[in-house]
Amino acid sequence: MPSSTVAKPKLAEKYPTWDGWVDSGEWAKTSPTGTLTLPANASEIMILALDPDVSVTQLARVTSRDQVLAARMLRLANSAYCAPLQEITTISEAVVRLGTASVRNVVLATCMASRLQSGNTYGVHGRGLAAHGIGTAFLAQLVARVAIVNQEEAFLYGLVHDMGKLLVLQLSKDYVRGGGKAPTEDEVVALLDARHAEFGGRVLREWHLPPVIEEPVVYHHRPDECASHPIEASVCYLADRLSHRYGFGCDASPDLPILDDPIATRLGITEAWLQDLDGRAPELFKSVTDAFA
């Protein structure tokens, strides 16, 4: 007796083009991965780090279970960026030095850097996106200090401001796995440019990160349209601009105007501050990227 089961149409039969599939939103159900996820250990550490009552002992114990994460925390705690007076040799000391919010950020940066090493998924874009995210994160902290907004939140939205690009790259591979024709490089780049901020917001909602992190990501190219967190969106915007100025994970644009930008003026950026950063940025970038290598 023949089976009554009706075969599901191939992905490419239902959605002949990749961008049509992406526009449909069906990928959230039909994609093998659906959306970007955090490893279980990383999720546990982030939850702990968000707990105002968490102890150094708790964080150190959980963090020590991940050798890669522990090594990166120690490297960062001893880097020129943190400038410790003496060498930090234990995870407990690193947690104290960095602070619980920074530990959360290091966890996410480590996960991001590790994920982007996957050439099969992110191809030639991966390493550049990792370096750009980490560089922008530290620049966002520096800008936030001037703007007098939360620096640890600034690190986080600076780090993940292009997270939507990772999802777009992942979806290009998932469509092929489902039987579709591989999109061209031009098609991928066009969607990256047009929708990465929107897709980044979707990823952060899946991760249950608060609006103060999500909205600066969604509006980092148009901060004046951000109603709820306009200052944070402006910090993210300017940090991204500075990252492009210095070539952090991308081609450098040293002539990119900063002081003429009204957003920089509103944030309190001065010529003296920018000149100081111009001199320090390359060394700081090297120290933090070495920590996450």
Describe the function of each predicted region.
Residues 1-178, 183-259:
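Conserved alpha-helical "signature site"
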Residues 244-293:
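C-terminal appended segment following the main domain
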